[in-house]
Amino acid sequence: MTITRLKLISREFEGFEASFRVQADHFEKLTGCVVEREFEEIHRLYDRMIAGKEALNGGHDLFLCVTDWLPEAIEQGLLLPLDDLIRENPPEGWPDAWAPSMRGLQTGDDGKVYGIAYHDGPEMFIYRSDWFTDPSEQESFASRFGYPLDVPVTWKQFVHVAQFFTRPEKEMYGALTASYPDGHNNVYDFLIHLWSRGGELVTADWQPAFHEAAGREALQFLVDLIHKYEVVPKAALTMDSVRSGHHFAQGGIAMMWNWAGFAAVAEMPGMSRIAGKVRTGLIPKGDGPGGRHMSLNIYWILGIAAGSTQPEMAYRFLNETASAAMDKVTSMSGGNGTRLSTWRDEEVRKQFPYYEQIEAVHQNVKSPLPIPEYPAINEVLSQMVDDALQLRLEVPEALSRAAGQVDDILRRSGYRQNKEE
């Protein structure tokens, strides 16, 4: 008897490996189809599936793709539109079982849907609640800073709290970033700080704006956390989001902003030394009049590679994995489910309390530019942040250089010309 096989490729992450294992086993029992799974480092995943166009060669049926890459993937025809398949057999509860913020980024300019949300961020403020509620720590903080120890609302308060909890002699640091130059969190950190101070990446007429006052303050703040205030360990310069999330879970860090999934990691006894001691909240805002609580709306969608030789079976897996039961599996395995039912599930919230805040966080989210050229812009921003964090360039010079490069990309791609015409 011939065994039907699907091939799935995803970013490497323990949560994805665990959830897809359960979901693939479930699908095999349901249909007899074996789902072979491959997990790749994020840069390699982009280089292979998007830049190298492996999505076209028939080597993979299912592709877990981050929304940053979708405009380019859609423009290049690397993913199949799902509209006809959804019309014939919609996912359970489609579309209202998902928040609007979980449905928009996978919809192309043509109005077609190119994937179903599989794993959500968002980025959240994650902190050691046991340290914040310790009476002796509260007394010491109030004596030193003149106001009560609490979850910081502004970035100025964040620095105060980080300074208070930084005790290198005890291997304690007030904060942690994911500053490895992989074009992922190092860029997203800058965007969050830019937006939380009222800044924007570009203007309405497609001129770079991130090098202006809010951007200077944002990038300098990230540099200062490591080099001036010394509240972030220098090892953060070598940590991507996954490594920083696991480092936080080992204890010794008071606060970080990171993907909500790492709040899940911190609550899993097999991975964490601080389970039951972690809470989440809103990311702090800028101290000026433009300050606002902001997070990043970036998520991972499961789509069908355009070269798939079995798109109907691939959709059956996608559809089944999008069900309420399987979406909950994603969350219980250490990822972040995307359905409202998962976010509101009592068992999920008991295991991972941060789900109580996810809907509130989604009220104030922004996304990177939804244009095919964004990956190229992202690389410029990644180099800019790394040049500043590694002290190769002063912040104004790093920003100015990057703004010129982004301007060149936008001009070459016709955005400025189109606006001026």
Label each region the model flagged.
Residues 86-87, 107-186, 199-235, 306, ...:
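Helix-loop-helix "hinge/cap" segment bordering the ligand-binding cleft or interdomain interface
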Residues 1-76, 90-95, 136-140, 289, ...:
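Conserved N-terminal structural module of periplasmic/extracytoplasmic solute-binding proteins
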Residues 170, 228, 318-340:
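Periplasmic-binding protein-like
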Residues 40-48, 153-157, 235-249:
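Short helix-initiation/N-cap motifs at beta->coil->alpha
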